[in-house]
Amino acid sequence: MSAAAPAGARGGGRLLVDGPAGALEVQVDCPAAARTGVAVVGHPHPLYGGSLDNKVAHILARAAGDLDLPAVRFNFRGVGRSEGAFDRGRGEADDMAAVAAWARARFPGPLLLAGFSFGAWVAWRLHPALAPRALALVAPPVSLYDFGRPAEAACPWLVVQGGDDEVVDAAAVRAWAEARDPAPALAWLEGAGHFFHGRLNAVRAAVREAWREALA
């Protein structure tokens, strides 16, 4: 049985934390009897309405909560109350690194990293430096951004992909995932679109079970 998070770390809500380009807005969701560790979640593209309130980002946080694990969603620079301006993924990686460092200091223990769409790209690029216990990529836009570095995953990982994604090339995601070594667990949701309308519980279940195994 996992130890509980330190008493001073419990609680949650909307906060501002220091980031590389100014303040970053974070949402902390912390169960009352949280275990040690934390999940950090990256949202979809900042220029197309992506924010920490995105429903897929929210469902990723709920998957962590199902395991009594605190979750931290955050707004990339220039979104919501986060300061700065869109930086084509470079500064956004710095934002995620800063939030992960803050989250780890607040909630010591294993780090679980997740991202949806643009946030999945940022998480993929950054995860070797963060050394998470596990990584979850939801609808990673492999045909839109360079997923060549890193070449391989540095931890156990999961890819969740909708078969009818209207934004991301689903076949390209499958081919990319299957070409990795080690390959990820692949949760293929036939008929699901990019935003997983009507399939959010399936996303939640896939991530929850992958993370449960990683934490065992």
Roles of regions detected by a PLM:
Residues P44-H45, L137-D146, G162, A192:
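Active-site nucleophile loop of the alpha/beta-hydrolase fold
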Residues A153, L158-Q161, D165:
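Short beta-strand/loop motif that positions the catalytic acidic residue
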Residues G163-V168, H194-F195:
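Acidic catalytic loop of the alpha/beta-hydrolase fold
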Residues D169-E178:
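Short alpha-helix in the alpha/beta-hydrolase fold that links the catalytic acid
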Residues A179-F195:
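Catalytic histidine neighborhood in serine/cysteine hydrolases
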Residues A192-R204:
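Catalytic histidine-centered segment of alpha/beta-hydrolase-like enzymes
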